[in-house]
């Protein structure tokens, strides 16, 4: 039987800012750019009570919470704290899969710490993190990987939740499908239209029905709902894509204005590719456009290297779909060849 722990720091960026500036501790706080068109990275729990959420525009957030304090992010500081957190993980297991600066899976199946108890290990890790950083973390513990992630949300903030082996079946049966990683809003709506709302609904349909009506994703979903998808902690990853994007303070009102943004985007993308040593592994170019009405479109083309002319053509193609709508965000990216020799060692700092 496997033992997985999912550790999730509590409103990480905001928590670091509140720790370093006590004046921010009891006010609604968010991390983001200073412009009204900026997008929030995260918000503390006080701000969340007003409906403020990550990925929300500054303008919208201020409408919900006029007293919201927005401070710029300090990524170098967050990375340093993340390194401290990773050091805590390493005391208990070498099987660590970071998902971001503030979140990771741990496989403690064979750990001898805390007499092998995953529950006690999670409790001690959270205490060690607090002692090292002054920050709180929440944890989920389960014999199935994705259940551990779901469980880490159950007692937030600064808590943990355990799903024991003999509780897995009942937990999955009542589980709303929207809580399963990989089931987004659009997918959930399609599943609901087929009468699928919980794990039990999926199990009743059976794997053959799920494949016939939902496709390969339906098979994977059935396996999760049936407790057949145990999962494993992956200590390596293959990067499949790399992209950069900018949200502009003022809308771009013509294709020409958008095209003028390409050189700076291309320079930033080139720098990131070179840093990751992936400049020779490109297999696709892509462009993303978000219009003022928040509709998003993209265009891509197979190509083996960065090419400004192709990016321009793709941008023009995507822009035309907006029917003269102003543009608030532009992004460009590349697909990366799937070659094992370019696997990247997982590092919290890479995510």
Swiss-Prot record:
Q: Which residues form the signal peptide?
A: none
Q: Which domain of life is it from?
A: Bacteria
Q: Does the keyword DNA-binding apply?
A: yes
* Domain UmuC as annotated: residue spans: 4-184
Per its Swiss-Prot or TrEMBL entry, what cofactor is needed?
Mg(2+)
Q: Write down the InterPro entries for this protein, in alphabetical order.
A: DNA/RNA_pol_sf, DNA_pol_Y-fam_lit_finger_sf, DNA_pol_Y-fam_little_finger, DNA_polymerase-Y, DNApol_IV, PolY_HhH_motif, Rev_trsase/Diguanyl_cyclase, UmuC
**Binding site residues for Mg(2+):** 8, 102
- Catalytic activity annotated for this protein? DNA(n) + a 2'-deoxyribonucleoside 5'-triphosphate = DNA(n+1) + diphosphate
Main function = Poorly processive, error-prone DNA polymerase involved in untargeted mutagenesis. Copies undamaged DNA at stalled replication forks, which arise in vivo from mismatched or misaligned primer ends. These misaligned primers can be extended by PolIV. Exhibits no 3'-5' exonuclease (proofreading) activity. May be involved in translesional synthesis, in conjunction with the beta clamp from PolIII.
> Quaternary structure per UniProt?
Monomer.
Q: Which NCBIfam families match?
A: PRK02406.1
Q: Which family does it belong to?
A: Belongs to the DNA polymerase type-Y family.
Protein name as catalogued: DNA polymerase IV
Species: Pseudoalteromonas translucida (strain TAC 125)
């Amino acid at each position: 039987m496997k033992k997985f722990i999912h550790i999730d720091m509590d409103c990480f960026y905001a928590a670091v800012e509140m720790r370093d500036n006590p004046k921010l501790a009891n006010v609604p706080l968010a991390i983001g750019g200073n412009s009204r068109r900026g997008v929030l990275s995260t918000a503390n729990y006080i701000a969340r009570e007003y409906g403020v959420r990550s990925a929300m525009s500054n303008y919208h957030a201020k409408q919900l919470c006029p007293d919201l304090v927005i401070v710029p992010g300090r990524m170098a500081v967050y990375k340093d704290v993340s390194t401290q957190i990773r050091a805590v993980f390493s005391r208990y297991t070498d099987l660590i899969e970071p998902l971001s600066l503030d979140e990771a899976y741990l496989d403690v199946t064979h750990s001898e710490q805390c007499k092998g108890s995953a529950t006690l290990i999670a409790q001690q890790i959270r205490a060690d993190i607090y002692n090292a950083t002054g920050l709180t973390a929440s944890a989920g513990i389960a014999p199935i990987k994705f259940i551990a992630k779901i469980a880490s949300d159950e007692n937030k903030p600064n808590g943990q939740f355990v799903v024991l082996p003999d509780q897995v079946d009942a937990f999955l049966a009542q589980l709303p499908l929207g809580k399963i990683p990989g089931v987004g809003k659009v997918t959930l709506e399609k599943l609901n239209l087929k009468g699928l709302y919980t794990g039990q609904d999926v199990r009743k349909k059976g794997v053959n029905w799920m494949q016939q009506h939902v496709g390969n994703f339906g098979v994977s979903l059935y396996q999760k709902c049936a407790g057949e998808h145990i999962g494993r902690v992956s200590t390596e990853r293959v990067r499949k894509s790399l992209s950069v994007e900018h949200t502009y303070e003022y809308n771009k009102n013509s294709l020409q204005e958008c095209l003028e943004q390409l050189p700076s985007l291309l320079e930033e993308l080139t720098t990131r590719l070179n840093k990751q040593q992936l400049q020779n592994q490109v297999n696709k170019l892509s462009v993303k456009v978000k219009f003022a009405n928040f509709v998003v479109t993209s265009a891509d083309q197979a190509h083996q290297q960065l090419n400004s002319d192709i990016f321009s053509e793709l941008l023009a193609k995507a822009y035309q779909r907006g029917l003269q709508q102003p543009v608030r965000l532009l992004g460009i990216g590349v697909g990366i060849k799937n070659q094992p020799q370019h696997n990247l060692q997982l590092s919290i700092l890479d995510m």
